[in-house]
Amino acid sequence: MTQRTKTRPVKVGNLTIGGNNELIIQSMTTTKTHDVEATVAEIKRLEEAGCQVVRVAVPDERAANAIADIKKQINIPLVADIHFDYRLALKAIEGGIDKVRINPGNIGRRHKVEAVVNAAKERGIPIRIGVNAGSLERHILEKYGYPTADGMVESALHHIKILEDLDFHDIIVSMKASDVNLAIEAYEKAARAFDYPLHLGITESGTLFAGTVKSAAGLGAILSKGIGNTLRISLSADPVEEVKVARELLKSFGLASNAATLISCPTCGRIEIDLISIANEVEEYISTLKVPIKVAVLGCAVNGPGEAREADIGIAGARGEGLLFRKGQVVRKVPEETMVEELKKEIDVIAAEMAAEREKEKQEQ
C-alpha cells in the first residue's frame, strides 16, 4: 500500500480526520437547506450509501436557522458552507454544526474572523479553508498572471496564517481546481508546505460519466502519492452517485476497510450465462455492505475460480449451472436458476462473520 503523508489529526463530530485514520468520504446536499424535511431525507440516503460527512450550503439566515433541526435527525457530521457573511457562521455554530467551511480572507475585517474563530474554538469545531483555482484573490492572480499551484498554496498559507495568528489550529484545507493537472500539482505542493489534513476534490468535474472519469484520474493520481485525508467526488448528478464513486475509488487503492468489492470479467464468446445482468444485480446487493468482502462473478467455469483466488466468495457460470467457490476453491455446483440466490446467501454468511470479527476486535482494543 502507498505510504500515507502524515498530517495532524482534527476532530469533526465523532470522527477524526488526518493522523493515522482512514480517508473519509464526503458529499454535499442539493436541496435548499431551509427545507429541513427534504434535506434530512437526502442526507439519510447519503448515509445509507456510505457518506461519512455531509456539507450543506448556508447562503442565508433561513438556512442557518435550519441547522439545529437537521442535526437532530441525522447521524453523520454536518458541515456548513459559508461565504462572506460571518454572522451565518456564528448561527451555524450556535445550531450545533460540526465543521465550518470558510475562507477567512473573504469574511471581512479581523474582528469578524475573530468572532468566528472564538465561537469555533469554544465548541471545538474545526474550520476548512477552501482554496479554489477559480476564485483566487486578486493580488495572487496579478502576481502569477493566472491560477497556478504556487498561487493556490500561497492563498492557503495566507488563510492559515490568519487562523494561526488567532491561535486556532483545528484546520482542514482543500485545494480544488477543475483542471486535473493543476489540482494534482497544488495538492502535492500543499502536502509539502503544511501538515494540516487535506480534503481532496476536482471541482466542477462534470456529469456522472465524464465527472467520474475526470475525478478518478485526478484524485487517483493524488491518492497514489499518499496524499489526502477526506474526499468528495463532485458530479452534476444525484449526490448518492458521488458517494458510490468515492467508495470505488478508495477500494481501488486499498483505502476502504468498510466496503465490499465486486470482481467480474469483461465477458467473451465463451460465456454461457447472462453475466452482465448478474454482475449488476450482485453489485447492487453488496453496495451497502460495510465490510471488506470481495465477491466474484465470472463467466467461465474453466478459468473463473483460479482468476479470482483473492475473492472471499464467487460464482463461475457454465451451461445450465454455476460453480460456487471460496478463495479459489470450488465449494459446490448449483443450478443456473438459483445460483445468484445461493451466492447472496453465502455473501450474507461471510459478511456477518466479518462484522462479528470486527466487533470483537473493537471490544478487545
Swiss-Prot record:
Pfam families tied to this protein: GcpE (PF04551)
Reactions this protein catalyses: (2E)-4-hydroxy-3-methylbut-2-enyl diphosphate + oxidized [flavodoxin] + H2O + 2 H(+) = 2-C-methyl-D-erythritol 2,4-cyclic diphosphate + reduced [flavodoxin]
Family to which this protein belongs: Belongs to the IspG family.
Cofactor comment: Binds 1 [4Fe-4S] cluster.
Annotated binding of [4Fe-4S] cluster, by residue: C265, C268, C300, E307
Protein name listed in UniProt: 4-hydroxy-3-methylbut-2-en-1-yl diphosphate synthase (flavodoxin)
Co-factor requirement: [4Fe-4S] cluster
E.C. code: 1.17.7.3
Gene Ontology molecular function: 4 iron, 4 sulfur cluster binding; 4-hydroxy-3-methylbut-2-en-1-yl diphosphate synthase activity (ferredoxin); 4-hydroxy-3-methylbut-2-enyl-diphosphate synthase activity (flavodoxin); iron ion binding
Keyword Iron-sulfur: yes
Free-text function comment from the UniProt entry: Converts 2C-methyl-D-erythritol 2,4-cyclodiphosphate (ME-2,4cPP) into 1-hydroxy-2-methyl-2-(E)-butenyl 4-diphosphate.
GO biological process: isopentenyl diphosphate biosynthetic process, methylerythritol 4-phosphate pathway; terpenoid biosynthetic process
Presence of keyword Iron-sulfur: yes
SUPFAM superfamilies given in the database record: Dihydropteroate synthetase-like (SSF51717), Nitrite and sulphite reductase 4Fe-4S domain-like (SSF56014)
Pathway(s) it belongs to: Isoprenoid biosynthesis; isopentenyl diphosphate biosynthesis via DXP pathway; isopentenyl diphosphate from 1-deoxy-D-xylulose 5-phosphate: step 5/6
HAMAP family: IspG (MF_00159)
UniProt keywords, alphabetically: 4Fe-4S, Iron, Iron-sulfur, Isoprene biosynthesis, Metal-binding, Oxidoreductase
